Design a protein with these regions (language model features):
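A short alpha-helical cap/connector motif
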Residues: 1-131, 138-159, 163-209
Length: 209
């Protein structure tokens, strides 16, 4: 299901600040070689993440689900001076590709790439985080969410990707895991939230208590 008219998506992309050389190189490689280019952060989404980092003056960022590194690079390029992006990838092959793209970029010193199960690794990380981006196993989103919400800073924002599941959240039992996640966030008294129809759906949540 196309959630947004493809013509509108192309128009939005054409009227968005282009990729930097580093994110462009990673995105181009991903399109040609990954076998699943839709898993990478698209331009509009990457620029939205960069905007959140910029306006929030984020210094500590956590990304769960590195894939080939496009999102991590977009985040690191706009992080505040002295800041760090910690990014977690469970697939060693994806992590290897991400490492090549990160090492070839001018922001490699701002990115810490961890390889392993995010459910275990997140619990070992110290907060607070000014921005958390979830883009990993959708069935584990609630677990990731519960692990990171207590580690958000006072001004911290959590962003979860693909929460509309290509429209499957609207169709009976399909998209069950993401429907459960969306309802979980909506019912959480600790946060306010907004669900955006950007890309495949972005859930933003920020602490109020």
């Amino acid at each position: 299901m196309d959630l947004v008219d493809p013509r509108a998506e192309r128009y939005a992309t054409a009227h968005t600040t282009p990729h930097t050389p580093a994110t462009a190189a990673a995105a181009s490689w991903t399109d040609a070689n990954s076998g699943a280019p839709q898993m990478a952060s698209a331009l509009v989404e990457s620029r939205l993440l960069a905007a959140l980092v910029t306006v929030g003056a984020a210094r500590r960022v956590l990304e769960v689900g590195t894939f080939t590194g496009v999102g991590a690079l977009a985040l690191a390029e706009r992080i505040a001076p002295g800041g760090t992006v910690i990014t977690i990838e469970s697939d060693p092959a994806h992590a290897e590709a991400a490492r090549r793209h990160i090492d070839a970029s001018p922001v490699a010193d701002r990115i810490e790439l961890l390889v392993g199960d995010a459910r275990e690794l997140v619990g070992k990380l110290d907060g607070p985080f000014d921005l958390v981006f979830l883009d990993a196993w959708k069935s584990d989103y609630i677990d990731y969410y519960e692990a990171v919400v207590p580690k958000l800073s006072d001004r911290g924002v959590l962003v979860a990707d693909n929460v509309l599941a290509r429209g499957q959240v609207l169709e009976g039992e399909r998209g069950h895991a993401l429907k459960a996640f969306n309802e979980h966030v909506q019912a959480d008294p600790r946060v306010d939230n907004v669900l955006l129809t950007v890309g495949d759906g972005l859930m933003l949540a920020w602490r109020t208590a």
